[in-house]
Amino acid sequence: GFLITALLIDEYHRKQSIDLLSFFKRRFYRIVPPIVIMVLVTMPFTLLVRNDFIASIGRQIVAAFGFMTNWYEIFIGSNYENQFNPHLFLHTWSLAVEVHFYIFWGILVWWLSRRKLTSVNFRGAIFLASTALFFSGYLVMFISSFLVKNVSFNYFSTFSHSFPFYLGAIYATMSGVADTTKRFKKNVQRWSLRRILFQFVGSFALLLLLGFVLSYDGQLTYLFGFALASLFACLMIYAARALHDKLPAVDEPVVVTFFSDISYGIYLFHWPFYIIFSQLMSNWLASLLTFVLSTAFAALSFYVIEPMIAGKEPKMLGIKLNVTPCKKWIIGSAGILAVISLIISFAAPKLGEFESGVLVDSLTQADTGMNLTNQRTAGDANAQNNVLIIGDSVALRSQDTFSSKMPNALIDASVSRSFDAAYETFKTNVDANTLPETVVLAVGVNSPDNYQSDIQQFLDALPDGHRLVLVTPYDAQEDTKMSAVRDYELQLAQDNDYVTVADWYQTAKDNPDIWGGTDGVHYSQSTNGADLYVQTIQDAISQASKKSAKGQ
């Protein structure tokens, strides 16, 4: 928002007009070739991971190329923090919002330029327009946070998440690139170097703090978080712009220039590379390999391939590059990658193994629940449930084993279930006076941040005469967080006789063979993972039955 608006203001200052066609042409050559290169390069790597990551990959590619990923994710009910099978091109949702901004804002600024305003009045008109659009967009996000249950709309929607661009546009009218304001020039003269650096570093620190204290599904994130993050980012931009004019004799470090040039490419490549490599190796090694390959391919794209497509001479940091001997190889490689991408897209399943398994398990769970309901209605005393298992997708994955080993247990499991979602099911049973004597809480992977208060609400609402079994969560990618949840649950079991722990975390650690080729949360179905999971819970239930219930 800042850079595009500042450049448009500079163009109007020079020409007293805006060339809309040239604007869109520049945006096309900057945005489209890199995203095509990213898709072509990353597609062969998908052959290294399980087919869950290429399920419906063709639709994801079409959404990315059409700059509609944000709406695609909204319509399929996706979650940005889906940690099981994240879409490889999910990150292009923000690029989609950016392109929507370019189209709308470019046309609006062009229309304003047709009013034949003076440069000062033109800047003022942009300020008023961007201010109105900023508050309108922020208001949409603010109000929607009270109305929508699925935060994906607020997060992905162009209407609610484009307001930061307009805040950047506001700051562009207050400073600029070539044509700057008198107020900005005075600030550069009056502000000390220390003050400028303090504003930059302080804003950056506050931005980091927001990243630690706010969560994706937290209401405060949408009420104030994104607005504050945008403000701190703009303060950093303003400080960096002032620093540039404050130190005119100091050249920008070459390293900074290099990464500035290829930052868009790194943004495009890093996500699919990390998702793929994190399935194959440790987190630190996946991060290192992601950084190296993202940097290499982003540099190749920016300095070599993009200039070739635009008909320009390739240059790297001002040094001319002779790539004529390599053109045939580059074109040939692109053709081969395109064929590979098409084959993978057409051969990809609509549903991956994990999604298919979840669908089958959900149907099995529904059928089992119906049978138990019918048996209770018929008055079969032996079918009375004394155990309710409220679980997430790991419990859902174990549905068949639960049915065979614990046929009288009622399973209520769903994908991506958090503590809050589990509490709704728990409280419904409490209010209806249908809560079984033993409640098994098998969640935690999807909401590890506020686990103390989340778990405490179950203890507070558990009626007298009941027992609670806590299943420790396990996620190989978030071992530190999972360990903290486990330690807390073990402490609760020591402090409360009616609380028992089913230590799935420790069982998972003791059986590394069940995790081969998985996401580190859902055991491989080709192993005895389901037996281990159910047995861990069954043993804990047996142990709980020998302990006092709440209030006894």
Q: Predicted regions span which residues?
A:
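Short amphipathic alpha-helical segments
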Residues: 107-108, 116, 400-403, 452-453
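A general structural detector for well-ordered alpha-helical segments in enzyme core domains, enriched
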Residues: 158, 454-458, 485-489
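A short helix->loop->beta-strand "cap" motif at the edges of active sites that frequently abuts
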Residues: 464-467
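Residues at alpha-helix caps and immediate loop-helix transition turns in enzyme cores, especially N-
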Residues: 220, 251, 451-454, 481-485, ...
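Cell-envelope and extracellular/periplasmic
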Residues: 440-445
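Extracellular/periplasmic envelope-modification machinery, especially enzymes
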Residues: 189, 295, 307-437, 448, ...
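Hydrophobic membrane-embedded alpha-helices
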Residues: 2-315, 320, 324-349
